[in-house]
Amino acid sequence: MPSVAIAGAGLVGALNACFFAQKGWDVSVYEFRKDIRTMKHVQGRSINLALSQRGKSALEAVGLKEYIVNQGVPLYARLIHNKDGKTYSRQPYGKPGEHIVSINRRHLNEVMITQAEKSPNVKFFFEHKVKNVDYDKKQLVVQCTSQPSKIPTFGNKSPPQEHAEFHVEADLILACDGAYSAVRRSLMTIPRFDFSQEYIEHGYVELNIMANNNEFAFEENVFHLWPRGHFTLIALANRDKTFTVTIFAPFSEFEKHMSTSEDVLSFFEENFPDAFLLLGKEHIADTFNRVKPQPLVSIKCSPHSFFDNLVLMGDAAHAMVPFYGQGMNCGFEDCLVFSETLEEYGNDIAKAVKVYSDGRVNDAHSINDLAMYNYEELKDLVNKSSYKLRKKFDTIMNSIFPKSWIPLYSMVTFSRIPYSEVIERRKRQDKILSRIMTTTSTLALIGAAAGIYVNRGKLGL
């Protein structure tokens, strides 16, 4: 059977292992961390994940959708918390019943690793760091960072010694090693490989609201949002009745208003009074004493495939800011689209990797841009009357033209319409709306002029 070597056992790497296990391929996965299933605490991001249609479709293809969805908390709307801490407004995500699912990142990752390992042809190699790619041999260069271990027979004559580097040969290489991908970095000298990286001015800090007498402290089936202009607080429910709370703010804001315990407590009490009471002074102060704000990066690159057997996927190809909840969903859709492409081309790897990259780059760039736009919506626009009017207009148009007029959020979240097509559809909607507004304004102006003419005598004109 064909063989695939996967760099990274995170969300996208683990899901790819599940896909290729189904296909019967020989699968080897190399991960620099220890097995997270054996660890008490896992370093790295823990922002809760919002599973939507694209991610669900990928999980369904490997038989995990139902189980994973049942492990999460459904969210049907945004709940906007006003600054007084007492009043709220609710914005449903889509049509009645449409929802996203709040999922714990670590649990999801563990489930997929365990699922993939059920296949005898799948091997995970933890504490094995992918260093780079050997261009000439089209192989991964891996370093064993702990004790020697058995390495798959393809391309290796003997197990490596501790800290020794070795080459991994496979018919297909999938780089799923994250935003700071070692594989992608080693490809940077290849001519015509385009790459861009942007750190936004905002960072984030995570906190937790504990269960209240074994009950949720807030309403659980909504996405809690405290939009305050240039900074924002969000909260998502977990199955254990806790909430993961995240504050996004410019680094300058963290330095100015959250650098001491006294300052951060005053800041939270003033801007998020209801959350402040549930988080508690001690937890807020302790968290900000221990944790520094983490950066947020947006990465684009093109192409996503190299040679005739290597593909970049997930954050290695398109790291994005988390404000559309599509980082995981896009990465999972990468796995699904590539699997579908391989099947379409009869497992012709060389053809499949090129076709995949040609089609996926534009989609990845598109959702990257949409994620940046959605932060403007989350931190400010949701409270503006123009945004609310547009949302109502989209809802009305969708009820009249359900197939041809789909709201932007619904296209991204509740469909598998390619991201690039989503943007084109939105542009057409904007043009139509602009014409309607122009026509309406013109008619209103003509009507006003006619009224003035009829009443010119009374008006002394």
From Swiss-Prot:
Tree of life domain: Eukaryota
UniProt-listed InterPro entries: FAD-bd, FAD/NAD-bd_sf, Kynurenine_monooxygenase
GO MF annotation list: FAD binding; kynurenine 3-monooxygenase activity
GO cellular component: mitochondrial outer membrane
Bilayer-crossing regions: 395-415, 432-452
Names of the cofactor(s): FAD
Record-given protein name: Kynurenine 3-monooxygenase
Compartment(s) of residence: Mitochondrion; Membrane
Entry's family note: Belongs to the aromatic-ring hydroxylase family. KMO subfamily.
One Pfam family linked to the record: FAD_binding_3
E.C. number(s) listed in UniProt: 1.14.13.9
UniProt keyword annotation of Plastid present: no
Pathway: Cofactor biosynthesis; NAD(+) biosynthesis; quinolinate from L-kynurenine: step 1/3
UniProt organism field: Caenorhabditis elegans
PANTHER family tied to this protein: KYNURENINE 3-MONOOXYGENASE
Main location: mitochondrion
Summary of the function given for this chain in its UniProt record: Catalyzes the hydroxylation of L-kynurenine (L-Kyn) to form 3-hydroxy-L-kynurenine (L-3OHKyn). Required for synthesis of quinolinic acid.
GO biological processes: 'de novo' NAD biosynthetic process from L-tryptophan; anthranilate metabolic process; kynurenine metabolic process; L-tryptophan catabolic process; NAD metabolic process; quinolinate biosynthetic process
Catalytic reactions on record: L-kynurenine + NADPH + O2 + H(+) = 3-hydroxy-L-kynurenine + NADP(+) + H2O
Organismal lineage: Eukaryota, Metazoa, Ecdysozoa, Nematoda, Chromadorea
Classification via SUPFAM superfamilies: FAD/NAD(P)-binding domain
Keywords for this protein: FAD, Flavoprotein, Membrane, Mitochondrion, Monooxygenase, NADP, Oxidoreductase, Pyridine nucleotide biosynthesis, Transmembrane, Transmembrane helix
Enzyme class, spelled out: oxidoreductase
Record membrane topology: Multi-pass membrane protein
